[in-house]
Amino acid sequence: MQVNDRVTVKTDGGPRRSGVVLAIESFSEGTMYLVSLEDYPLGIWFFNEIGHPDGIFVEKEAS
């Protein structure tokens, strides 16, 4: 994924929410994505863990 990509994010107890990637930070354990959501237009950070399917919170939106 890249900055400005449309994505969906997994949140606690609700449906996936649509947003836009504002920034990306890579770490050895995975990748942090700053995603602008309707409720958080300045962005909120989500972490995708490497090698753990349950740890994937940000996915690229289907075209």
Curated annotation (Swiss-Prot):
Q: Which InterPro entries match?
A: Dextransucrase_DSRB
Cysteine disulfide links? none
Coiled coil spans: none
Pfam families in alphabetical order = DSRB (PF10781)
User: To which protein family does this belong?
Assistant: Belongs to the DsrB family.
**Name assigned to this protein:** Protein DsrB
Q: Which organism is it from?
A: Klebsiella pneumoniae (strain 342)
